[in-house]
Amino acid sequence: MASTRAKPTLPLLLALVTVVIPGPGDAQVSIHPREAFLPQGGSVQVNCSSSCKEDLSLGLETQWLKDELESGPNWKLFELSEIGEDSSPLCFENCGTVQSSASATITVYSFPESVELRPLPAWQQVGKDLTLRCHVDGGAPRTQLSAVLLRGEEILSRQPVGGHPKDPKEITFTVLASRGDHGANFSCRTELDLRPQGLALFSNVSEARSLRTFDLPATIPKLDTPDLLEVGTQQKLFCSLEGLFPASEARIYLELGGQMPTQESTNSSDSVSATALVEVTEEFDRTLPLRCVLELADQILETQRTLTVYNFSAPVLTLSQLEVSEGSQVTVKCEAHSGSKVVLLSGVEPRPPTPQVQFTLNASSEDHKRSFFCSAALEVAGKFLFKNQTLELHVLYGPRLDETDCLGNWTWQEGSQQTLKCQAWGNPSPKMTCRRKADGALLPIGVVKSVKQEMNGTYVCHAFSSHGNVTRNVYLTVLYHSQNNWTIIILVPVLLVIVGLVMAASYVYNRQRKIRIYKLQKAQEEAIKLKGQAPPP
């Protein structure tokens, strides 16, 4: 306990008050001082005096040790020592047959023997009430003693201690714990205020106690891992929880089948996670319990799940031969293992699942690079799992040189740009030559920038490989311009001009003839009209 205490210099005689009690000859008894204020265990001198004129017997009644220091005919001076608590010493006299007395008030002050903040809980949940308990032992006068509860330097509560100094007192105060209280120091301080008596304010402070708070979400840790584990694979097990505090104090771990696999945990500001990589082997039980456990403060949050371990081999897809010549027979077979069944084999009509499916085909050129697909299914824990296998067939066949691969007739205009396509195909890829029958000139396959008359002719294309050969004729016709053609080209426009002129002249002639006929008819009509109007002779 840390404490501060001053040694006060207190006047032992503070006041003089006389108590008068009538007696023979108006005798009076008095006590001095009437009030005294001193530290516990201290001493004070008390004077008892009387105005009695007759036979006088004077004394002091007290519970403390007393020594008579001096005396006179009608007074005595006593010293009281080791005064432990508040008391009222009494001066008394026997004056003749009359008794009288006077009392004083002694007030004792003392510092608390101990000030202690009761131990705090190991962990306090955020949002819950935290009761601080300050235990005060001793201290007087209690009317001037108070207890202060602190969070760091912040005053949370100040309360009077009260009660009898000999009785220990507990002062309580309730606060609502928050995240900000994590790591905060709480303490209790007593304050003995003797300033009204001309002294100072004396304080004792308890040892500080540190508080740890925690907060947990309403959810449980989240497991992110498949329910099914396949033998021969590596599976990632992951568990996490968000919204907790303080995440740095939390511990999270994974437990698989009662064993803790090698794992790595991560703590961030308000979340934690655990990750484990597990090699699934045949030694594993078919069902394994998986637990994710989070520990924070005195709380444990847990998530459980049951994992199923299975062994599922891919189906075995075989071809009797991966490479065959055209026309050969090929057997395609798919076999399932580990309790699985074949549900699909390309080339076979759908049928009920069975452990094995096969069929035979005659290989043709269309089957070259044909993919065969096989799928097997396995039911595990009510779920259907699928695995597939694919194989490719290679068929050897002779060269092909059809109309679509190489046109038989080509007609080009001399001087134009053309592209000639002629390509044989087969497996293995055939070689091909195209030569003109007349002189063996090569067929211009590809891009021809300027067609020439000399390219005209009949060409023979021959494609061959280790699996056969094929021949195809290609006719190339080149249209070109001769000198007679130029004469025709010149004469045609001239003739067209002459014909046009003749037609124009005929049109003008016919028009003039029609006009003359029209005028003649008009003249005849006018003559007949005049003749009808003449008077008879």
From Swiss-Prot:
Keywords: Cell adhesion, Disulfide bond, Glycoprotein, Immunoglobulin domain, Membrane, Repeat, Signal, Transmembrane, Transmembrane helix, Ubl conjugation. Residues 510-537 are cytoplasmic. GO terms for molecular function: integrin binding. Gene3D superfamilies: Immunoglobulins. Glycans are attached at N47, N185, N204, N267, N311, N362, N388, N409, N456, N469. A motif (Cell attachment site) lies at residues 151-153, 179-181. Its main location: membrane. It comes from the Eukaryota. The record marks N469, N485 as: Not glycosylated. Residues 41-102, 127-195, 232-299, 327-381, 415-468 form the Ig-like C2-type domain. CDD domains: IgC2_2_ICAM-1_like, IgI_N_ICAM-1. Disruption phenotype: Spontaneous onset of obesity in 16-week old mice with higher levels of white and brown fat and a slightly heavier liver. Enhanced susceptibility to high fat diet-induced obesity characterized by a weight increase and higher levels of white and brown fat. Monoubiquitinated, which is promoted by MARCH9 and leads to endocytosis. GO terms for cellular component: external side of plasma membrane; extracellular exosome; immunological synapse. Expressed at low level on a subpopulation of lymphocytes, macrophages, and endothelial cells, but is strongly induced on these cells, and on fibroblasts and epithelial cells. SMART domains: IG. The chain crosses the membrane at residues 486-509. Residues 28-485 are extracellular. It is a single-pass type I membrane protein. Homodimer. Interacts with MUC1 and promotes cell aggregation in epithelial cells. Interacts with ARHGEF26/SGEF. Interacts (on T cell side) with CD81, CD247 and CD9 at immunological synapses between antigen-presenting cells and T cells. Belongs to the immunoglobulin superfamily. ICAM family. This is Intercellular adhesion molecule 1.
